[in-house]
């Protein structure tokens, strides 16, 4: 078992009643409210640390933050992390000290723009740690023992400060594992995160075991038993041996003594107003059975280090599944319910995403590898081990890693966990995946350091751009990767603008053709293109790059399938559409040609020898649809191709694409619709609504 149940204590909780009371803004100073619950014991001055985004302009540069509950002030510490282009706060880590809260109780905390800065107060320092503080990680191999000690690393160098203030401070130290003679292992590396709420107060310790250096000779799979000791006891023992492939890592966290057992329910309407998360339909009442099924599947899945829990082990696996959507199924459930069970799954899966071999750390600066630092960096199998500019070939030691990453089927594992917790681990995970997505080709095809994703499948382009934009959006301003991520995002949007949105020779269908890979090079998957359209709309909302021209151009494909002359919406969400007559021919010039070429491929039975009128019962029968006016491709499924189209149409409405409002109304008027209460992953609506 990983340390999730010790850092995130909620495995045994069932969840409070769903009805929440969020305070509404009563004055211009009010920003957002949170609900804080006590899942521990009756206590006073209870700390709660969590991440929060801020709507652009809500907390201007130089302004301070304050909090109150029941009209009484609540001590607050803000560690600012990322800002909007106007200098206002975008993301930070908030720590509250709740004066008193009974076990099982909850209180609504209103966060406001302070009228004046709080008086200065001394920050918690390392001197607050217990005199005997240490956390020791021991890795036992067949022929050696390697050890890393937090105490020795604290004594040997200056720690990195992640949080600092009067309520909480957090420090990070790191170093190689060493053998009995003190010799450093060239590959295995330990990180310790130490969060102190003050002398005699709760203390959280996090251990990360890393096997992820890039460009270090001889990368290998490591086989060992692991043990972590702290505060006079063994807090973790691996039991069966751990098999850790190169370019992976794992995490374990624990409380030194008494845990902090507060749970913070985020404010989804505010998150959506900040445009940090997809605009889910807030009218959806998530079924309790969906949460129970999630909890049951999660409990049945292995969660030990190097496991994957309910993440698909083999990411290239095709077909609908829980981890593929704008955000994974469990994150959609979490956002729409704020249920502790979904919260725990959201964090646990983010932890276990570290098990995949998609992690390359730069030995020179200890940051995730970037293409700026290594423009010829590539993880493509044709290049690894093929020269001095390329990565060395790993030695798996006879072990076949069951986990395979894939950009085309990559879940958004880490953005939301970092957003809501502010945990440094999740930030690095997000950065690792963002840069890995750009590396899977010959560097010339991505224009080296630009990191263009045009080389990949359309769905891979969609998900890679999503992850890159999330990393650029939320990486702290002072983080070395911030400028690189923003530059790569802007380079990608510029390429699409020049190739499509602003090109007089761009295709009339407004598709990303990618050689139309279906039906002998004549057809493409509109649902993959819809993923891309949603992603561009999401990127535009995040606000770091102007993607408006691309969104207006791209959204016309979704709108055209609903409203273009000669194209019946019955085929709008088909699995494939014919977009050219032969593999070497030009794309069709209009949607009517696409419809005429595609209709015969969709018929379930040969119709009578007469024209099939759009919206008619005859067409519905020929297509095997439940009712006239329905759309092909799983019209009743909340995880079907019709559902996949919904976020793209919503993005088109948000982007002001001509005809998008009419297309959305027509889409919503179809008689057969999915029930999103069990599966809300694609229940995304226009932000105008």
Language-model features: where?
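Bacterial N-terminal signal peptides that target proteins for export
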Residues: 2-14
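N-terminal signal peptide c-region/cleavage motif recognized by signal peptidases
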Residues: 23-26
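Alpha-mannosidase-like glycoside hydrolase catalytic domains involved in N-glycan trimming
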Residues: 29-145, 161-176, 195
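Glycine- and charge-enriched low-complexity intrinsically disordered segments
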Residues: 146-152
């Amino acid at each position: 078992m990983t340390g999730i149940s010790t850092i995130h204590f909620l495995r045994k909780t069932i969840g409070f009643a769903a009805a929440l009371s969020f305070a509404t803004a009563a004055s211009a100073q009010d920003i957002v409210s949170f609900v804080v619950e006590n899942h521990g014991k009756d206590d006073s001055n209870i700390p709660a640390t969590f991440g929060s985004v801020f709507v652009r302009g809500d907390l201007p540069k130089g302004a301070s933050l304050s909090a109150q509950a029941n009209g009484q002030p609540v001590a607050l510490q803000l560690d600012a992390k990322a800002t909007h282009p106007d200098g206002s706060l975008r993301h930070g880590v908030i720590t509250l000290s709740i004066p008193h809260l009974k076990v099982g109780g909850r209180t609504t905390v209103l966060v406001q723009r302070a009228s004046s800065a709080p008086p200065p107060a001394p920050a918690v320092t390392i001197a607050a740690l217990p005199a005997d503080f240490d956390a020791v990680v021991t890795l036992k191999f067949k022929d050696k023992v390697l050890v890393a000690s937090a105490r020795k690393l604290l004594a040997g160098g200056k720690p990195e400060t992640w949080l600092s203030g009067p309520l909480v401070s957090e420090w990070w130290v790191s170093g190689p594992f060493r053998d009995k003679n003190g010799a450093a292992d060239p590959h295995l590396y330990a990180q310790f995160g130490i969060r102190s709420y003050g002398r005699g107060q709760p203390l959280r310790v996090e251990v990360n075991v890393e096997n992820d250096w890039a460009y270090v000779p001889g990368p290998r799979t490591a086989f060992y038993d692991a043990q972590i000791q702290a505060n006079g006891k063994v807090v973790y023992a691996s039991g069966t041996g751990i098999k850790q492939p190169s370019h992976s890592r794992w995490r374990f966290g624990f409380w030194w003594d008494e845990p902090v057992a507060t749970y913070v329910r985020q404010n989804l309407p505010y998150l959506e107003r900040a445009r940090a998360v997809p605009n889910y339909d807030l009218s959806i009442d998530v079924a309790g059975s969906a949460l129970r099924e999630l909890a049951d599947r999660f409990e049945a899945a292995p969660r030990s280090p190097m496991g994957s829990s309910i993440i698909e082990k083999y990411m290239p696996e095709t077909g609908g599944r829980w981890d593929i959507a704008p955000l994974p199924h469990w994150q959609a459930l979490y956002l729409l319910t704020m249920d502790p069970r979904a919260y725990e799954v959201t964090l646990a899966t983010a932890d276990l995403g570290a098990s995949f071999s998609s992690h390359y750390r730069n030995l020179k600066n200890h940051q995730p590898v970037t293409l700026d630092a290594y423009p010829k960096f590539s993880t493509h199998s044709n290049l690894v081990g093929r020269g001095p500019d390329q990565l060395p070939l790993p030695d798996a030691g006879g072990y076949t890693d069951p986990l395979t990453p894939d950009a085309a089927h990559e879940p958004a594992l880490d953005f939301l966990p970092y957003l809501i917790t502010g945990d440094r681990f999740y930030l690095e995970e997000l950065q690792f995946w963002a840069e890995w997505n750009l590396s899977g080709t010959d560097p010339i095809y991505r224009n080296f350091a630009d990191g263009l994703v045009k080389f990949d499948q359309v769905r891979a382009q969609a998900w890679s751009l999503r992850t890159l934009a999330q990393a650029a959006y939320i990486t702290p301003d002072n983080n070395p990767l911030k400028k690189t991520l923003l530059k790569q995002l802007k380079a990608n949007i510029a390429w699409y603008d020049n190739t499509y949105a602003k090109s007089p020779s761009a295709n009339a269908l407004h598709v990303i053709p990618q050689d139309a890979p279906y039906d002998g090079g004549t057809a493409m998957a509109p649902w993959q293109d819809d993923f891309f359209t949603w992603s561009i709309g999401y990127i535009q909302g995040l606000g770091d790059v102007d993607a408006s021209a691309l969104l207006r151009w791209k959204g016309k494909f979704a709108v055209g399938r609903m409203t273009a002359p000669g194209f019946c919406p019955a085929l709008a969400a088909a699995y494939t559409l014919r977009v050219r007559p032969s593999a070497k021919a030009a794309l069709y010039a209009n949607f009517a040609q696409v419809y005429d070429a595609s209709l015969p491929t969709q018929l379930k039975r040969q119709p009578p020898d007469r024209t099939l009128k759009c919206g008619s019962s005859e067409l519905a029968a020929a297509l095997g649809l439940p009712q006239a006016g329905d759309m092909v491709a799983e019209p009743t499924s909340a995880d079907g191709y019709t559902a996949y189209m919904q976020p793209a149409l919503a993005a088109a409405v948000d982007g002001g694409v001509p005809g998008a409002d009419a297309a959305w109304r027509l889409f919503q008027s179809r008689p057969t619709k999915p029930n999103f209460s069990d599966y809300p992953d694609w229940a995304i609506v226009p932000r105008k609504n």
